[in-house]
Every structure is written in C-alpha cells, then in structure tokens.
C-alpha cells in the first residue's frame, strides 16, 4: 500500500510553534490582533495580506521546520507501516509559501529524527493531483480543505483532526486525533 502523510500538524507538532509565533509577530508588527478567532489559518485569523503572511513564514521557517517535535508516536507508527512493506510518501505544502531552502531543512529534520520514508514531495498545494500521480492508496492530513478535496476526488483519507477543527463526515474519511488511532486503523484492517 502507498501511504501519503502530511508533515505539519500530522507528523510534526509544528502548529503550536506557528500559532505562538503568529501571535508574537502580529504584536511586534502592530497588527490588528485576532480578527477571526475561529479561523485555523493565521492569515485569516489576523487578517494579514498575502505579503504579510509570506514575510511571517519566511521569518519563522527555520523554527518550525527544524525544531518542531514529532507528534507522539508518529515515528513508532510510521516505522511500523514502513516495516510492514508500505511505501511512505510525505506530501507537504512546505516550500510553497516560504524559504527556498525549506526542503533542505526538512530533509535534515527527518534525518535527525531517523524517519523512514520512501519519497517526499514539497510545495504540494494541490494534494489531490500529487496523490493521483503517485497512486497513493490513503492520505493522512490535518487540513480540512485538503481532506475534503481528497475525499471528494474518491481517495481514502485519514483526517488528523486537531482540537477545535470542524468535523467532517464522508464515506472516504476516517477521523482520528492521535497516532494511536492511526495504528489501530492499519493494525485491525
């Protein structure tokens, strides 16, 4: 089986770093404060322009790319899946919005964390196309927008739902909140 896995918010717990850094960035740059408190995206939450968001991401890319901790048991479950003969492809939007060196930093972080994978695809803002091109059987992602698009395209997806993220029901979607639940899905099916 070919398994696609997102990095930020799924493999790495980078979301807390991004949320905290965004709050500090907005204060330091005399932003408007929180404008849309329910938004999960920093640009919408603080009503930043595309340029402001790009500047923010470029400023913090090294921090979340290399310093974000792995989600609990992510390595254990990914190693298990890899050892079972599954092909692991990391499919990430990293590199689409920030530093041109984010791919190098990401590969170093994966190496530092001794992560097993077969391939990594960067700057994938259209994950549906990447999934189809790579013939991915199931994708693990935390972005509701990606989950909806993947499910509607007929692909199976595991929605790694963060606290506060909206629910989404679809015949192609399994919803989880941690890597133990992902392990159960693969171990019992």
Give the ranges of each region predicted by the language model.
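Active-site neighborhood of HAD-like aspartate-dependent phosphohydrolases
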Residues: 1-52
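Short, basic/glycine-rich phosphate-binding loops at helix/coil junctions
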Residues: 45-61, 86-88
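Substrate-recognition element of Asp-dependent hydrolases with the DxDx(T/V) motif
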Residues: 64-69, 74-106
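Hydrophobic anchor at the start of a short beta-strand
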Residues: 87-89, 117, 155-157
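Substrate-recognition "cap/lid" segment bordering the active-site pocket of phosphatases
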Residues: 95-138, 144-148
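Structural recognition of alpha->loop->beta junctions
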Residues: 106-121, 169-189
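Acidic, Mg2+-coordinating phosphoryl-transfer loop and its flanking beta/alpha structural elements
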Residues: 139-174
């Amino acid at each position: 089986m070919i398994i696609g896995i997102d990095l930020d918010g799924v493999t790495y717990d980078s979301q807390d770093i991004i949320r905290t850094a965004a709050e500090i960035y907005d204060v330091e740059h005399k932003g408007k404060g929180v404008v849309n408190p329910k938004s999960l995206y920093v640009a919408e939450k603080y009503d930043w322009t595309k340029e402001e968001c790009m500047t923010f991401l470029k400023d913090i890319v090294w921090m979340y790319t290399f310093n974000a901790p792995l989600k609990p048991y992510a390595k254990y479950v990914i190693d298990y899946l890899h050892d079972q003969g599954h092909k692991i492809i990391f499919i990430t939007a990293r590199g689409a919005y920030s530093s041109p060196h984010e791919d190098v930093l990401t590969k170093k972080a994966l190496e530092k964390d001794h992560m097993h994978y077969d391939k990594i695809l960067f700057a994938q803002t259209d994950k549906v196309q990447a999934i189809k091109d790579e013939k991915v059987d199931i994708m693990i992602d935390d972005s509701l927008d990606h989950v909806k698009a993947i499910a509607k395209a007929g692909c199976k997806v595991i929605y790694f739902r963060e606290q506060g993220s909206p629910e989404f029901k679809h015949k192609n979607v399994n919803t989880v909140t941690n890597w133990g639940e992902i392990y159960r899905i693969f171990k019992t099916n």
